[in-house]
Structures are given as structure tokens and as C-alpha cells.
A protein has these predicted regions:
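Charged, cofactor-coupling segments
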Residues: 1-100
Length: 100
């Protein structure tokens, strides 16, 4: 099953932001049965860099910065071999790690 993950924030009459990815629900390779059953995980399908130019890292937790950096590392790892020239340069620039 494919799910849309769409966290967003909208200020009425002002502005809004939404970051959206499509993800496939996948079974864990070696599931550990718990009192709640076994779990699934999300495999990201839409591997698109998140535009970080308006992110203020002073307002972000270390965990949030780490999540963006891990996501961008995965986007680059999977897409860089498929790109060349200007597209590759753009991908590398847009997946640079965030720093404080």
C-alpha cells in the first residue's frame, strides 16, 4: 500500500508549508513479535530533496537536523548514480548536510 506523508502548517490568511512524500508500507525483514503484534516500516518512494533554503536551524532540534541530513544522504546515495552534468550538480548542492 502507498501512503502520502504530508506534514504541514498553515497560518490562516498568512502562509503555509507542506513537505510531502509518498511511501510504501513494507514488512520488516525479521519481524520481532511484540505484545502489539509485528510492525511495518515506510520505504520512501519520492526521493526528492527538501528545500532547506528557508530552514532556520536555530529553531530546529538536533534530531530534526539529523533527520533531514539522513534523508538527504539517502536521496543522494540513490539518485546520484542516475544523474550527470547540471542535474548531478543540482542534486549535490540540494542535499548538502545542514549545520548549525
Amino acid at each position: 500500500m502507498v501512503t502520502s506523508i504530508e506534514p504541514g502548517l498553515y497560518r490562516p490568511g498568512k502562509w503555509g508549508i507542506r513537505i510531502e512524500n509518498l511511501a510504501a508500507n513494507q514488512a520488516v525483514a525479521n519481524p520481532q513479535e511484540t505484545e502489539f503484534g509485528s510492525f511495518l516500516y515506510f520505504e520512501t518512494l519520492t526521493l526528492c530533496p527538501i528545500d532547506t533554503r528557508l530552514m532556520d536551524t536555530a529553531l530546529m532540534t538536533d534530531g530534526e537536523i539529523d533527520w533531514v541530513n539522513r534523508y538527504h544522504a539517502e536521496v543522494r546515495r540513490r539518485l546520484e548514480p542516475l544523474t550527470e552534468g547540471a542535474a548531478k550538480a543540482w542534486l549535490i548542492k540540494r542535499t548538502e548536510p545542514l549545520a548549525r
